[in-house]
Structure formats: C-alpha cells, structure tokens
A protein has these predicted regions:
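Active-site neighborhoods and metal-handling regions in enzymes and metal-associated proteins
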Residues: 1-393
Length: 393
C-alpha cells in the first residue's frame, strides 16, 4: 500500500481524503488495499484516513489498540460512542469531500459497503461523502503485467479442461452410456483439482436444452439430466491457480450433440458471437484513437446489436464483469443494464465479454471471452474465441 500514490490521485481528483472504515472484516476491498490481514479479532470499529496532503490518521478502539499498527500514521483511541464521535470530529476537522466504499443509490453494489448509519454520522459532521469507486478501480482492481501471467497460465489449463469435458461427453454419446450434467460438472472440478486450479468452491455451469435458459443454472444430483443426441449444451467454467494472488479465467462455450444443429440454434449462437465481436471492435477502436471508454459504453454496443436482431428482451444481464482474484472482481463492469458503470476501462483492466440470449423454457446461448487492456492500451482476448458451435458426435 503506497500512501504517496493514493495522495497523488486524491489531489488529481480533487478529493480531500479517503476514509477507510471497517467492522468485523466486512470491507474486503479496504483490507486488501491497506494490506491488512483478516486474521485475529476484529470486533470493534476502526477508521483510517488518508488525507490528500499530510500524515494519515488511525482511529482504533482501546480493546484492539494494535489493529492498524502495520500502517503509517498518527494513532488516536476511543472507547465509548461519544468519544468515537468526538475523535472523528477532531481527526477529520472542517467539512471535506471524502471518498468511502459507498455507491450513491447502490449504483455499483461491489463498492456499496459502508453502512448507511456511518454515512449519516459523517454527513452529520458536515462532510460530503462520495464514492471511492474510481479509487478502488485504480488501487485494487487493475492487474499488472506480472500478475496477469497467472491468468494466462490458468487459461491454458481451463481451455484444456473444457476440451477434456467435451471428449468425456463424446465418449458417453458413442457408447450409449450418457453422462449427466452433474457428472460433467464434477469431472471438471476433479480435473481442476488435478491441475492445481480452484474455482473457490463455485461449481461450473453445465446445462442442456432449457436448463441454461436460467443463466446461472447449475446441476445437482437431483435436477441433473443425461446429455444425449440432439441436445443443446452450454458450459460455463472458471478457475485460477491455487496460490495467493492468482487471477481467474472465465469462459462460456456452447455445443450441440450431433452433426446437424438446428438452424435456430446456430442463428442464436451467431448473434451472441457477433455481439461479442462488435463490443470488442468498438473497444479496440476507441483505445486505438487514444480515447477514453467506460464499461457502460461497451455494454451498449453488444446490447444494441442483439436488440436489432429482435432478441433484446432475452438478453437479461450485463455484457461482462470485472475479473481479479475473485471471478467477479471490483473493477469496471461492462454494464449499462443491471447498473450504469461509469468507470473507465484502464490499462490493467481485465473483464469478460459474454452476451447471451435466454428463451425461458426453451434454451440459453452465451459466448464468453476474457479481455485484458495491456500497458500499451491494447485490448486483447486472453484465450480462445469460439467462432462456431462445437459438434459432439
């Protein structure tokens, strides 16, 4: 955690300070940025204020006086709530514009961490509380070109595992001993384990026919179906290397069990594929012109394409999400649907592009790639691109 770099950005953005607040390790974003461990007791509130200029300030409870000792700055203590309020007045001083892990109107839920009561308390002291979303994007969500190597390494193994899953399904089809959705899900998890990967206990999505019309369907022993000839198949799988700091890789592919997929299914796949292509081309064009581009703008391109093809009502989620140490990261999402993500896509941003079409009770189609913006401001796809349906027979 580099206080000086944070202060430089605060000055650039015209913000008086960044106030970190936590209780019971609720703010995982703040803990990561500050380099704090979640180990040990965390039963009392603490505050850490980084002003745009000057020395940082720590405010901790006397029951846990060493909670922020790894951080630079002057330390203040409190015990009761009245003293807490007085210390906050003293520490923060005259009314200021202060960033916190807060999102107006809960616009970006990933950032909406500080409780409403604490916001009320600080506003009552005369301060303007603004969102730290742009700061989080810069100091938590961007991935340097050393760390991104773990993403590429995981990607090769995940791609390999997907091919193995398709082959496992093919064996079942040819033998007449059909594999179930759940069996393929468990096969993927076992292969992840064997390869030193983890999905953080979130199982992959494996669904046939109408099952993936629920975009986040995942099979269980109770709801699982056999994967048989003429089935339409969707597999969404994600994993990272099982080591600290590793970055996720997350893809979705579609397949047909047979050699002659229905025309409607082919057409729907081509629509989502081309929406994905259009979104990437727009992003690359903007970056090539050295223009800024926000997550919501890229979503608009993919969404408009699907709407023009007549399936806008069936595209029921954002076009993509930030990726980091968690499969859903804390950076800019490709979203002007579930939220309007105004954050800029910057060098170091890693995210998915995954437009989809979901017809309830019938089928679901999605095509997902991961995109990284490197230090040269080039947007690159980090793995394979699916161009046609995989045919399994």
């Amino acid at each position: 955690m580099k206080v000086e770099k944070i202060q430089e950005k605060l000055v650039e953005l015209g913000i008086d300070g960044w106030l970190f607040y936590d209780f019971h390790n609720r703010d995982k974003i703040g803990l990561k940025i500050l380099g704090l461990s979640i180990q040990g007791l965390a039963t009392r509130r603490w505050f850490y204020f980084i002003p745009a200029n000057g020395e940082p300030i720590k405010l901790v409870h006397r029951v846990e006086p060493d909670k922020l000792d790894t951080l630079p700055g002057k330390k203040f203590f409190y015990s009761g709530w009245r003293e807490l309020h007085e210390r906050l007045k003293e520490i923060l001083g005259s009314p200021k514009k202060i960033a916190m892990q807060y999102s107006p109107m809960n616009a970006i839920p990933y950032i909406s961490i500080v409780d409403a009561g604490t916001i009320e308390l600080l506003r009552g002291l005369g301060h303007e509380i603004i969102s730290s979303a742009d700061l989080v994007q810069i100091f938590e969500a961007l991935i340097d070109e050393n760390l991104i190597k773990t993403h590429f390494e995981a990607g090769k193994l995940v791609d390999e595992t997907l091919d193995e899953a398709f082959e496992e399904i093919r064996k079942g089809v040819r033998s007449g001993k059909y594999k179930t959705e759940y069996e393929i899900q468990q096969f993927i998890l076992k292969r992840f384990y064997d390869k030193g990967l983890t999905s953080d206990e979130d199982p992959p999505i494996v669904g046939v026919n109408d099952h993936p019309s629920n975009p986040h369907f995942y099979p269980t022993p109770e709801n699982s179906r056999e994967i048989k000839p003429e089935d339409k198949l969707l597999i969404d799988l994600w994993a990272k290397k099982n080591e600290p700091g590793a970055i996720f890789y997350d893809i979705t592919w579609c397949a047909f069990i047979g050699d002659e997929p229905p025309e409607e299914y082919v057409n729907l796949f081509h629509i989502v594929r081309d929406a994905r292509r259009e979104a990437l081309a727009f992003l690359q064009n903007r970056l090539n012109q050295n223009l800024e581009v926000a997550g919501w703008e890229v979503d608009e391109v993919a969404r408009r394409y699907i709407q023009e093809k007549g399936y806008g009502d069936y595209f029921t989620h954002r076009t993509g999400h930030s990726i980091g140490e968690n499969v859903h990261g804390n950076g800019a999402n490709i979203d002007n649907f579930e939220t309007q993500d105004l954050r800029k896509l910057l060098p170091g941003s890693l995210f998915s592009l995954e437009p989809g079409i979901y017809i309830p009770g019938k089928l679901g189609v999605r095509s997902e790639v991961n995109v990284y913006i490197n230090s040269e401001k080039k947007a690159i796809i980090t793995g394979r691109e699916q161009e046609e349906l995989v045919l399994i027979y």
